[in-house]
């Protein structure tokens, strides 16, 4: 098992999860974070840190592993992030919205740290 970041992170990107990860397995996109499933040690300390409940065990993945694939693919090309940055100023406007991945996801990498 590994943990994955899901749709709820898009445009919110709080990053509380980043600083508690003991193996630094988070990677940063412009408006979304992912977990590298090959680096995640399944400890679960990141899951309760997310205020929008975007982090789930891959056993709760929907759509035949959609989120596991997204996390694995983008962890290969986005920079590693180990220090919490500033979340987007407008994040509260998107916290309760659903279907954010299809509407707002950006493939552009973040800055990393």
UniProtKB/Swiss-Prot annotation:
Gene3D superfamilies: 3.30.70.20. The keyword Glycoprotein does not apply. GO terms for molecular function: 3 iron, 4 sulfur cluster binding; 4 iron, 4 sulfur cluster binding; electron transfer activity; metal ion binding. Keywords: 3Fe-4S, 4Fe-4S, Electron transport, Iron, Iron-sulfur, Metal-binding, Repeat, Transport. Its cofactor is [4Fe-4S] cluster; [3Fe-4S] cluster. It holds the Pfam family Fer4_4. Disulfide bonds: none annotated. The keyword Lyase does not apply. InterPro entries: 4Fe4S_Fe-S-bd, 4Fe4S_Fe_S_CS, 7Fe_ferredoxin, Fd_C, FdxA, RnfB_subfamily. Residues 2-30, 31-60 form the 4Fe-4S ferredoxin-type domain. [3Fe-4S] cluster binds at residues 9, 17, 50. [4Fe-4S] cluster binds at residues 21, 40, 43, 46. Binds 1 [4Fe-4S] cluster. PANTHER family: FERREDOXIN, OXIDOREDUCTASE. This is Ferredoxin-1. It comes from Caulobacter vibrioides (strain ATCC 19089 / CIP 103742 / CB 15) (Caulobacter crescentus). The lineage of its organism: Bacteria, Pseudomonadati, Pseudomonadota, Alphaproteobacteria, Caulobacterales.
């Amino acid at each position: 098992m590994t943990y994955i970041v899901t749709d709820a992170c898009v445009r919110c990107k709080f990053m509380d999860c980043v600083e508690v990860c003991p193996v630094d397995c988070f990677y940063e996109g412009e408006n979304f974070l992912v977990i590298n499933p090959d680096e995640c040690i399944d400890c679960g300390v990141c899951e309760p840190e997310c205020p929008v409940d975007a982090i789930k065990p891959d056993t709760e993945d929907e759509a035949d592993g959609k989120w596991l694939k997204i996390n694995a693919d983008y962890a290969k090309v986005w920079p590693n992030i180990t220090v919490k940055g500033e979340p987007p100023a407008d994040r509260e406007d998107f916290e309760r919205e659903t279907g954010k991945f299809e509407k707002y996801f950006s493939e552009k990498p973040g800055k990393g740290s």
